[in-house]
From Swiss-Prot:
Biased composition regions of type Basic and acidic residues, renumbered to the chain: 388-404, 471-483
Source species of the chain: Macaca fascicularis
Compositionally biased spans, kind Polar residues: 405-414
PROSITE patterns listed in its UniProt record: KRAB, SCAN_BOX, ZINC_FINGER_C2H2_1, ZINC_FINGER_C2H2_2
Major subcellular site: cytoplasm
Zinc finger (C2H2-type) in chain: 507-529, 535-557, 563-585, 591-613, 619-641
A GO BP annotation: chromatin remodeling
Family to which the UniProt record says this protein belongs: Belongs to the krueppel C2H2-type zinc-finger protein family.
SMART domains (alphabetical): KRAB, SCAN, ZnF_C2H2
Keyword Repressor: yes
Protein name, entry field: Neurotrophin receptor-interacting factor homolog
Subunit (UniProt): Interacts with SETDB1 and TRIM28/KAP1. Interacts with ATRX. Forms a complex with ATRX, SETDB1 and TRIM28.
Cell location: Cytoplasm; Nucleus, Nucleolus
Region (Disordered) location: 136-159, 339-359, 388-414, 456-485, 632-653
Length: 653
């Protein structure tokens, strides 16, 4: 059956056929007396609703017949006479339908019952719709599974939002149906009858803001179920476990970092599902220059300065040199080996082409602008360095300056480059047996393509996996002291990983043994042991370790409370305070005890609760030695000593 439901945007007058439910003779025969009685009540109620809103319509004969009979359904509609024998002789007015043998109800094909008074008719309409849910074979034109899914939870705004975002035009029969469906889903999501314009705008901005966050941060924020933008801002500002580089938008390199080593969030999403290749099973597929290069879109390229672009060009040349040094094939179209070349050739690799691409993140378009000459210049540059190295008679030196430094630091294996193979190729170049382009076609078996460290046997292909490994390695490095046999398929990614082994990102406190990833956090922590408080309040002379703490303290004197709760209007002078307060409205308890499962809104409450499991009492009285789990309990206990001391000093009367 086809649905003809009037929508809130329709300007056409509503008639009785638009709000009625029709049954075929087969469907009517499956209904019992109770269901038929329910049908009669709903039909009469729909008619009364139309009359109540002053719709000028004449009473249909169907309504008159329903008012006169408890279970009216004539024989002409295909129902056996024995079900309603007392009305078997009743005839219909032929003016109601061009087919005298059929009732007007036979031409009404409506799946759902829609009334103007939803509060009254809603429960009864649901009972009518339940008839279809009990038996999906009632009608051969029953709605598809997708339409049934869309009918579930019609009042759930989140479900309506997801269906609105996942809407596909191809699922509709035409543009009018598609537009009506979109309007209905949007109406269910935004609920304009219950929300103001400001609240609707807040919902739209909230969705867009969440989509603009980095993937890792957005996943965590959505798990907290924020209801508005203020809660999202408070959550993001309170995040301390994510690095500054991960928070920066894609295409905006952090200060002091090498732009060529950055991989955008869009690339990480595309590469997230890529497989990790073990070291023992090396890929046999030929590798091209695009497989080991770092890509920038045109928008990202526009954000780079001249120095960063020059650095990018140098690294791309260096990466190409690495390919040549280990014998990877990079071919140019329309270039073939000379007929007199007697060097055995293996299966050729895919050609390296520099051309425009329709992808958002493309290497070829940017590389063409950057290298200013394409692959030909890169090849000539590499060959010049090879010839220069030979003229200086330094057979043990790599063809690039940074190779030596990397070999000394242990990041590159000296066996990765087959110098004998390169010398033989150079001799053929000098003898005229090979031209410069043919040198690049000589292939050394790509068994040396991956760079290793020392202890673990893994392979990493993407920057996101490098970062994950960095964090796990930093936690274990101080305890184990061993190297890492992590393997990478991209030399640029390996350079990023080398920083871990230098120890620049791991800082251990000599006083308490605490480890910090960020040197700035470590410098702040050291002031706790030294007692240094360089930031002093001019009003009261109180000192602080951090400038942010001083700024927060100064609001006590000025009375400034810039953070306001949108729910109750309460104001706060600190971000962390409003973040904790918002949890009282949302009911979020993110800190959960691993022993008993009890959850808390604040981490300090969880720490205090865990002492009931461990029995720890860190606050001890220096006079009697009694220990307490909370500092407030210790302060209250110390007052008993002070009162006793004062009583002893008072003279007896």
């Amino acid at each position: 059956m086809a649905s003809r439901l009037p929508t809130a945007w329709s300007c056409e007058p509503v008639n009785f056929e638009d709000v009625t439910l029709g049954f075929t003779p087969e469907e009517w025969g499956l209904l019992d007396l109770k269901q038929k009685s329910l049908y009669r009540e709903v039909m009469l109620e729909n008619y009364r609703n139309l009359v109540s809103v002053e719709h000028q319509l004449s009473k249909p004969d169907v309504v008159s017949q329903l008012e006169e009979a408890e279970d009216f359904w004539p024989v002409e509609r295909g129902i056996p006479q024995d079900t309603i024998p007392e009305y078997s002789e009743l005839q219909l007015d032929p003016k109601l339908d061009p087919l005298p043998a059929e009732s007007p109800l036979m031409n009404i094909e409506v799946v759902e019952v829609l009334t103007l008074n939803q509060e009254v008719a809603g429960p009864r309409n649901a009972q009518i719709q339940a008839l279809y849910a009990e038996d999906g074979s009632l009608s051969p034109d029953a709605p598809s599974e997708e339409v049934q899914q869309q009918g579930k939870h019609p009042g759930d705004p989140e479900a309506a939002r997801q269906r609105f975002r996942q809407f596909r035009y191809k699922d509709m029969t035409g543009p009018r149906e598609a537009l009506d469906q979109l309007r209905q889903l949007c109406h269910q999501w935004l609920q304009p009858e219950a929300r103001s314009k400001e609240q609707i705008l807040e919902l739209l901005v909230l969705e867009q803001f969440l989509g603009a966050l980095p993937v890792k941060l957005r996943t965590w924020v959505e798990s907290q179920h924020p209801e508005n933008c203020q809660e999202v801002v408070a959550l993001v500002e309170g995040v301390t476990w994510i690095s500054e580089e991960e928070v920066l938008p894609a295409g905006q390199p952090a200060e002091g970092t090498t732009c060529c080593l950055e991989v955008t969030a869009q690339q990480e999403e595309k590469q997230e599902d890529a497989a990790i290749c073990p070291v023992t099973v090396l890929s046999e597929e030929p590798v091209t220059f695009q497989d080991v290069a770092v890509d920038f879109s045109r928008e990202e390229w526009g954000l780079l300065g001249p120095t960063q672009r020059t650095e990018y060009r140098d690294v791309m040349l260096e990466t190409f040199g690495h390919l040549v040094s280990v014998g990877w094939e990079t071919t140019l179209e329309n270039k073939e080996l000379a007929p007199n070349s007697d060097i055995p050739q293996e299966e050729p690799a895919p050609s390296l082409k520099v051309q425009e691409s329709s992808r958002d993140c493309t290497l070829s378009s940017t590389l063409e602008d950057t290298l200013q000459g394409g692959v030909q210049e890169v090849q000539e540059t590499v060959l010049k360095q090879v010839e220069s190295a030979k003229e200086k008679d330094l057979p043990q030196k790599k063809h690039f300056d940074n190779h030596e430094s990397q070999a000394n630091s242990g990041t590159l294996d000296t066996n990765q480059v087959s110098l004998q193979k390169i010398d033989s190729v150079e001799s053929q170049v000098n003898n005229g047996a090979l031209n410069t382009n043919q040198v690049l076609l000589q292939k050394i078996p790509p068994r040396k393509q991956l760079r290793k460290c020392d202890s673990q046997v893994k392979s990493m292909k993407h920057n996101s996996r490098v970062k994950i490994h960095q964090k796990s390695y930093e936690r274990q490095k101080a305890k184990e002291g061993n190297g890492c046999r992590k393997t990478f398929s991209r030399s640029a990614k390996q350079i990023t990983f080398i920083r871990i082994h230098k120890g620049s990102q791991v800082c251990r406190c000599s006083e308490c043994g605490k480890i910090f990833r960020n040197p700035r956090y470590f410098s702040v922590h050291k002031k706790i042991h030294t007692g240094e408080r360089p930031y002093v309040c001019q009003a009261c002379g109180k000192g602080f370790v951090q400038s942010s703490s001083l700024t927060q303290h100064q609001r006590v004197h000025s009375g400034e409370r810039p953070f306001e709760c949108h729910e109750c209007g309460r104001t706060f002078n600190d971000r962390s305070a409003i973040s904790q307060h918002l949890r009282t409205h949302t009911g979020a308890k993110p800190y959960k005890c691993q022993d008993c499962g009890k959850a808390f809104r604040q981490s300090s409450h969880l720490i205090r609760h865990q002492r009931t499991h461990t029995g720890e009492r860190p606050y001890a009285c220096n006079k009697c030695g009694k220990a307490f789990t909370q500092s407030s309990h210790l302060i209250g206990h110390q007052r008993t000593h002070n009162r006793t001391k004062r009583k002893k000093k008072q003279p007896t009367s």
